[in-house]
Amino acid sequence: MARRPDRLDALAAEIDQAGGTALVVDADITDRTQAEAAVQQTVERFGGLDTLVNNAGLMLLGPVVGADTQEWDRMLASNAQGLLSTTRAALPQLLEAAEAGPRRVADIVNISSIAGRVAWNGYSVYSLTKFGVRGFTESLRQEVTQRHVRVGVLEPGGVATELGSHNKPEVRNQMIDPFLEQTEVLVPEDIADGVAYMVTRPRHIAIGELWIMPTDQV
């Protein structure tokens, strides 16, 4: 589920070729109606849902003084409200899967960031959203863990994705490019490995927090 159907189609083709089954859902999770419809479409296709990975996000950096408040709104909509909408929509199915599904456990993995653990100059609103994800994850974990829905947060350091490319040129030049030039960053497969580890533990084990960093990153 994402707003990039071309990439979803390519990924689905890889999954199909590997013998799996994939469903492509073109949805904007900042629209609650679309988020709820996407979850429902998934349930109808597969007959249920036992794992949710909230990975959508936006990182727009820069000072608070003179900031473009539309950038704040976009980050709050994607990083916070979108995560809330998909989680709320999926929870009934996850609780049902934990009670009666073949695994007898269900999983929510929220992708946060090191910026949800440590605050830096220029990361203020992005960190606000990611600290919020961390707090929400732990609170929800306490709410549903005894019903065998495991809720965990995965906090990556620097990863080679397009996340930084949406920033203004001056932000990229001052904050992002120098970091990338001196750090051997993670690749998306490293984060996928972390997610897979979290959701494949035995039923009696829950990973509440997983912090994955490049070795070079201080």
What is the meaning of each model-derived region?
Residues 113:
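Residue(s) in the substrate-gating loop at a strand-loop-helix junction
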Residues 65, 118-124, 183:
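Active-site loop immediately N-terminal to the catalytic Tyr-X3-Lys motif
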Residues 63-64, 68-73:
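Substrate-binding pocket helix/loop in short-chain dehydrogenase/reductase
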Residues 153-154, 161, 173-218:
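C-terminal helical subdomain
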Residues 5-6, 27-38, 69:
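The beta1-alpha1 cofactor-binding region of Rossmann-like NAD(H)/NADP(H)-dependent oxidoreductases
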Residues 87, 129:
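Active-site helix of classical SDR
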Residues 118, 139-149:
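Active-site-adjacent segment of SDR/Rossmann-fold oxidoreductases
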